[in-house]
Amino acid sequence: MLKTGGLSPSLCLLSLLLALHSAERSYPPPQRRFEYKLSFKGPRLAVPGAGIPFWSHHGDAIPGLEEVRLVPSMKNRSGAVWSEISVSFPSWEVEMQMRVTGPGRRGALGVAMWYTKDRDQVGSVVEGLASWDGIGIYFDSSSNDVQNGPAIRVLASDGHDLQEQFGDGTVRELGSCLRDFRNRPHPFRARITYWRQRLRVSLSGGLTPNDPEEVCVDVEPLLLAPGGFFGVSAATSTLADDHDVLSFLTFSLRDPGSEEALQPFTEKEQFHLARKLEELKARLALGTREDTILPLNSKAQEEGERFFNLEDTLSRQSQILQALQALSRQMDQAEKQWKQQLGSVVQIRPEGGWNTAKVSTLLYGQRTLIQALQEMREAAAQMASGAQVFYLPVGTKHHFFELDQTLGLLQKDLRDLVKMTAKPPRPSGWLPGFSTCLRTSIFLFFLLIQTVGFFCYMNFRQELDKRLQEYLFTESISLQPALPIPRTIGVLRRQPVSPSMQA
């Protein structure tokens, strides 16, 4: 009997690993296709007054033209954005750029990127989940351990778990790594790739614009069914940071060379398409502009695109220019009136001569006022020139509100100047700083007369009282001549003293 020797287990394991590695390297890179309905980026990230196309924002999220501020630097706030269209392809890749800035070494709760079965299930709270089905990549900046944070964690749930807290060592954490993404000089980039039931999270440091990417988490096998929704959320606690998302780009992945099979049209669809083709040919033959523009407009409405009304913007700018020109003319008139008044005051010169200090004060005040008017004119001219080239998008009412306030202030200042110039002319002998009140010498003269009269009256009153006392005393003596002296003295002691006698 012949015996054959088998391979050792170590050689079998090594050959298996080499086969897997060669098979993995033999796979060509997937073919990417940009999905614009699941993406957003600047510079026209949000439509003024309409939000982000194909996305919805919730909580304290603020869509802008360059970025989406999920949460401002305020305490106990939360916000999120969610895609309105579900993911219809099995494999995908997301490139996200974000910026988290704030004071101190510890940050707020952080940012989370979601792929869940139901949108708005997670909401805008990142520190706890209720019931959700999908995955979440959590950029945690609230770690108490500064040396071991911030951290990036990959979480998963099947929709049957109760509320769990991040960062406490739960079994739902598929992987994590430590990477500081706060207060970077450049936006922090994250690439999340799901391809062949494998989830890979790659990160760039944000120290330079072109930092190389490093793999943070690589999980397989992981089954994610299509039909989910993308979302990004953030929240703050007692510590506050600015959480901004600059771009969120989604790509669908498929094997290279594998094109989607075109299904044959049915007879009903062929008949419908043929009729549409005939209608289009008829419209093109007529060459009417309305018929050719109508399909474009309907298509734009279906795609959710919005066009700006340029005529309305130009009409508003023309009204602003007219108002500024009218203000400039009124300022010219006010300046001319002030110059005329200044010339008339200089020409009038009294006989006694001017007070040099008062005249210089008046002239300095008028020169200051004329200079202020000139500055107002220059400001109005700058506003007019800026309004000719500045673009105001329709729907931003705050620009026009600021312009209305500015025009109102200019009109108020102009009305005050007109009222000052409309005062009646002063007499020719009027001096600057001269008061029309009573002179000091006249006041002192009348005060002296009043004092002299008062003292004369008091002297006359004292003389009258003295004569009256003498008269009463002589009459009392003539009526009682026989009274003895001691008795008379006793009677006088018992009688009350009159006020006139006291005087």
From Swiss-Prot:
* Tissue/organ expression: Predominantly expressed in the sublingual salivary gland, in the mucous cells of the acini, but not in the serous cells, nor in the duct system (at protein level). Not detected in the submandilar, nor the parotid glands. Expressed in the mucous glands, but not detected in the serous glands (at protein level). Besides the salivary glands, expressed in the Brunner's glands in the duodenum, but no other mucous or serous glands (at protein level).
| Spans within the Cytoplasmic topological domain | 461-503
GO CC field: COPII-coated ER to Golgi transport vesicle; endoplasmic reticulum membrane; endoplasmic reticulum-Golgi intermediate compartment; endoplasmic reticulum-Golgi intermediate compartment membrane; Golgi membrane
Q: Which residues cross the membrane?
A: 440-460
The protein depicted here goes by the name: Protein ERGIC-53-like
Biological processes annotated in GO: endoplasmic reticulum to Golgi vesicle-mediated transport
Is Cytoplasm among this UniProt entry's keywords?
no
Q: List the disulfide bonds.
A: 177-216
